[in-house]
């Protein structure tokens, strides 16, 4: 659906059937289909979304699809079984944790024009799994799921750099699981001086923030 906030009009630009048929041989009866994680490009011209479908045994398959904002489906950016979390790196590039054509699950930069994949340094070779990346200007943030010690971590990096900064670790107890689990889901303030995140390390779900102005100074001075 496309919502015009000026005229308060809503228009269907893509149906689920359109998405199912786009560059696939999938049946809309053999699988359960869902669409989620819709994200509009910074320039407002395109958007990406996940086409997620399940077979009769519950096995999940993911596709990452690119469309323009008029509902013209443009390209399947990923169709290798698993797509997790994505963010627009810039108007022409997606940063995503997904399975690439070589079968590797990692952080990848995808050129929406060529479809080429490039490993995102410094995270593409780290063995710590999925996270929730977010980008603002030249800064990139992501998190981790709880490790064996039940600690979740925040990592800050910079575009075109191999450096990363660990901002902290936060305990996630077993009392929070299933629907009550709490991912950190880090995101930048618009000014870029703060990172906000959710956590349960205090024993209840709370929104926290970290001031990163000093770390940004360190990054900018190499």
Regions found by a protein language model. Name each.
Residues 1-18, 50-77, 93-94, 100-120, ...:
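Beta-propeller blade-edge and WD-like acidic-aromatic loop motif
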Residues 20-47, 74-97, 124-143, 173-191, ...:
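Conserved beta-propeller blade repeats
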């Amino acid at each position: 659906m496309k919502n015009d906030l000026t005229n308060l009009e809503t228009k269907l630009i893509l149906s689920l059937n359109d998405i199912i048929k786009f560059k696939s041989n999938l049946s809309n009866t053999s699988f359960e289909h869902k669409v989620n994680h819709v994200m509009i490009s910074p320039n407002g011209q395109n958007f990406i979304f996940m086409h997620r479908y399940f077979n009769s045994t519950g096995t999940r398959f993911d596709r990452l699809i690119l469309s323009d904002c008029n509902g013209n489906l443009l390209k399947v950016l990923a169709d290798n079984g698993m797509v997790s979390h994505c963010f627009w790196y810039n108007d022409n590039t997606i940063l995503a944790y997904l399975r690439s054509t070589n079968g590797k699950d990692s952080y990848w930069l995808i050129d929406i024009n060529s479809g080429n994949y490039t490993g995102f340094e410094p995270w593409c070779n780290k063995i710590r799994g999925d996270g929730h990346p977010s980008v603002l200007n030249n800064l990139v943030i992501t998190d981790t799921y709880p490790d064996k010690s039940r600690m979740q971590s925040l990592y800050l990096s910079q575009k075109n750099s191999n450096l990363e900064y660990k901002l902290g670790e936060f305990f996630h107890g077993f009392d929070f699981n299933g629907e009550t689990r709490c991912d950190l889901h880090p995101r930048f303030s618009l000014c870029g001086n703060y990172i906000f995140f959710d956590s349960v390390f205090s024993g209840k779900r709370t929104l926290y923030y970290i001031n990163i102005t000093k770390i940004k100074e360190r990054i900018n001075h190499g």
